[in-house]
Amino acid sequence: MAIEIKGYIVRDSDQQIYDWFGIATTAPQNIRKAIAEANGAPLDVEISTCYGGDVFSGSEIYSALRGYSGGVHIRITGLAASAASVIAMAGPNEMSPTAQLMVHRVSSIAAGNYHAMDKSSNDLKEADKAIAAAYVAKSGMSEKDALKLMDAETWITAAHAVELGLVDKISDAATPQLINAAYGLPLPRAVIEKTRAMIAEGKAKSKEISKEYLDAGKPTAEQIQAKKDFAYAKLNLLEKSLFI
């Protein structure tokens, strides 16, 4: 059974929001569903162009694939960056000669006094070690060497990945479209939560208007305006999230 991992790695609860904006994502629930449908048959996982994303969601996907008893084979055909590079370590793998891996340190946003900053720093260091463990388990390199790669925000070619032991072999594949790597998720947390509330409000308002004018036989002015307002709000949120 084939699974494609692409776009951004996001939480299950956030995927609906990204879908709403038409942004490609992969969430743990997609992988769990595919594993259930495979029912013990081998999985052919293709990482096409995946920019990484949420650390914990990436860990869930990695663990689900690594623990699957039916067999997993992973092909990197475009870009496996950040959290996606961790997922690429979940089983026997191969990499297109034109593909790339990218590994780097975990990042986050924190606020507070110096105690909070110290805690945030320590948490990030522990998260880095957890991610490095995937590279260590795959390649046999030391944790120190794995963290050194992450320190430099390293871009790794297929040949170098094989040399490092991160990839088992180089495969033949079509040349992927050249892209610029994106850092961080394209939708800030505040935009996700605001959109979630707006969708819920829009659904409730739509039901209220539909019930009130059920016998009208055609859309009312209020219904048309409500749909326009909802569309404008969606476009405004998308503009702010992508261009700030």
What is each of the regions a protein language model found here?
Residues M1-A83, A90-A99, S107-I244:
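N-terminal organellar transit peptides
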